[in-house]
């Protein structure tokens, strides 16, 4: 199974790149984790936000593999504690499909992305900066993997 993070935004601060890559490199070869960055639509005071969201959504869904399980990251999604995320990861592996996790832009996810999702995951009831979400998702998935393999990274 391959994990894919599909995120709106291409110019992340160095600390985001450093943090994300740190966890990315820790994943084992049998569970590769990749990032697909989607250019954010131009936002200005006269921007058509609905159209921008639609375009970002089209690009996000185009980046997802044909049979991938789509999981959106969204505040109203299901919150998973770390052991629950580890169980999810095991279920995803047993399913046999690759998993694409979608992070929207400043206005969130396009309705088409939400409609295509099989699951929606809420990291927190807080609104988080989207660059930070990349690092949190990578760390959370690495921690979940460590639980499923009895790796010493996670401690109770």
UniProtKB/Swiss-Prot annotation:
From which source organism is this entry?
A: Yersinia pestis
Subunit structure, interactors included: Homodimer.
Which reaction does this chain catalyze? pseudouridine(1915) in 23S rRNA + S-adenosyl-L-methionine = N(3)-methylpseudouridine(1915) in 23S rRNA + S-adenosyl-L-homocysteine + H(+)
EC numbers, comma separated: 2.1.1.177
> Tell me, what does this protein do in biology?
Specifically methylates the pseudouridine at position 1915 (m3Psi1915) in 23S rRNA.
Keyword Nucleus attached? no
- Mind telling me which residue stretches traverse the membrane in this protein? none
Which family does the record assign? Answer: Belongs to the RNA methyltransferase RlmH family.
Domain of life where this protein originates: Bacteria
List residues binding S-adenosyl-L-methionine: 73, 104, 123-128
InterPro entries per the record? Alpha/beta_knot_MTases, RlmH-like, tRNA_m1G_MTases_N
A GO molecular function annotation here is: rRNA (pseudouridine-N3-)-methyltransferase activity
Group of enzyme by EC: transferase
Question: What gene is this protein translated from?
Answer: rlmH
Instruction: Please verify whether the record's keywords include rRNA processing.
Output: yes
Give the record's GO CC terms: cytoplasm
Q: Enumerate the UniProt keywords alphabetically.
A: Cytoplasm, Methyltransferase, rRNA processing, S-adenosyl-L-methionine, Transferase
What is its subcellular localisation? Cytoplasm
The record's PANTHER family line, in alphabetical order, gives: METHYLTRANSFERASE, RIBOSOMAL RNA LARGE SUBUNIT METHYLTRANSFERASE H
Q: What is this protein called?
A: Ribosomal RNA large subunit methyltransferase H
């Amino acid at each position: 199974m391959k994990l894919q993070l599909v995120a709106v935004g291409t110019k992340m601060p160095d600390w985001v790149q450093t943090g994300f890559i740190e966890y990315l490199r820790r994943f084992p070869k049998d569970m590769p984790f990749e990032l697909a960055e989607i250019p954010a639509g131009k936002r200005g005071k006269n921007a058509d936000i609905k159209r921008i969201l639609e375009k970002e959504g089209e690009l996000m869904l185009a980046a997802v593999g044909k049979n991938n399980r789509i999981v959106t990251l969204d505040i109203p999604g299901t919150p998973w504690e770390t052991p629950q995320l580890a169980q999810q990861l095991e279920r995803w592996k047993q399913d046999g499909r690759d998993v694409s996790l979608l992070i929207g832009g400043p206005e969130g996810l396009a309705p088409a992305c939400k409609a295509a999702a099989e699951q929606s995951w809420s990291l927190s009831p807080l609104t988080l900066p989207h660059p930070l979400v990349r690092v949190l998702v990578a760390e959370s998935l690495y921690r979940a993997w460590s639980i499923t393999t009895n790796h010493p990274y996670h401690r109770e």
